[in-house]
């Protein structure tokens, strides 16, 4: 569960390393975001010569959470940390590589590109 002020790792090669959630999109008083939800983030830590710079405000999709996601069969998939993938204005990933596993819940029309780039889909 990601909320405002939550810090997330970046799971792509866009140049950002850490981002902070500044808004959960979808609803006027929505408090939490889970896997597959879109959030507004600001870049807190970036590498030199990356595609994004520190202080930039971006949109991102949550790909891993410590809270996890419950499947229909009752199983829960949890991760060691929270991670997101940065998106451009057309909701496409900025980076060309995805690091770490992602869940099957991202297999919607919007995020098939992220699933195809990921090394492992759980």
Swiss-Prot record:
The keyword GTP-binding does not apply. It comes from the Bacteria. SMART domains: Ribosomal_L14. Keywords: Ribonucleoprotein, Ribosomal protein, RNA-binding, rRNA-binding. The keyword Ribosomal protein applies. SUPFAM superfamilies: Ribosomal protein L14. Pfam families: Ribosomal_L14. InterPro entries: Ribosomal_uL14, Ribosomal_uL14_bac-type, Ribosomal_uL14_CS, Ribosomal_uL14_sf. Gene3D superfamilies: Ribosomal protein L14. GO terms for molecular function: large ribosomal subunit rRNA binding; structural constituent of ribosome. PROSITE patterns: RIBOSOMAL_L14. One of its GO terms (cellular component) is cytosolic large ribosomal subunit. One of its GO terms (biological process) is translation. Belongs to the universal ribosomal protein uL14 family. HAMAP family: Ribosomal_uL14. Part of the 50S ribosomal subunit. Forms a cluster with proteins L3 and L19. In the 70S ribosome, L14 and L19 interact and together make contacts with the 16S rRNA in bridges B5 and B8. Binds to 23S rRNA. Forms part of two intersubunit bridges in the 70S ribosome. This is Large ribosomal subunit protein uL14. It comes from Ectopseudomonas mendocina (strain ymp).
